[in-house]
């Protein structure tokens, strides 16, 4: 029963906390948004320390810092999976960049037992950034200030310090949310401009 599976329900509506695969929320959102305010909270690891647990003894070994850091731009790939709901006034989104400790069991199939291992737990230890997306105009937070007129995804990538594939995902979302618009092409690249709202 989809009504029994929400994370939090109070006088403000429903809060859904989803750490990945936002597409799994589609069925819930199609029901909940007809009657309730829904806030989707999507936490992403900014700084992560990984520790390994020996499953037979419980000993914790080799804590190390992960070289990968997420940025708020990395959320776009997941948000695109629920884009059909993002213009609904009852849906709000909160992106969290958090520091965390992650624990995995040394039970994988590789010689060091790390590949194919099972994640045991993730523990948040701090919040680095909170981004609230309560209406389409809030998505303008993702547009670097120096971009004004006639820019490409390569220009966007350089200004935002992200790779071009991520920039393309961000611009696809911003175009869908009617915050930027395609105004032409140069070679194979689309040219974008900021959408004016009066």
Where are the model-predicted features located?
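Short, small-residue-biased leader/transition segments that mark boundaries at the very start
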Residues: 2-3
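Conserved catalytic cores of phosphodiester-cleaving nucleases, focusing on short active-site segments
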Residues: 6-21, 25, 32, 38-40
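A basic- and aromatic-enriched beta-loop-alpha substructure that forms the phosphate/nucleotide-
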Residues: 28-89
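Long, low-complexity, charged/polar intrinsically disordered regions in eukaryotic proteins
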Residues: 62-134
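Short acidic, hydrophobic short linear motifs in intrinsically disordered regions
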Residues: 147-159
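Short amphipathic alpha-helical interaction segments
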Residues: 162-175
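A short, conserved structural fragment
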Residues: 175-186
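Short, cationic-aromatic polyanion-contact patches
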Residues: 185-198
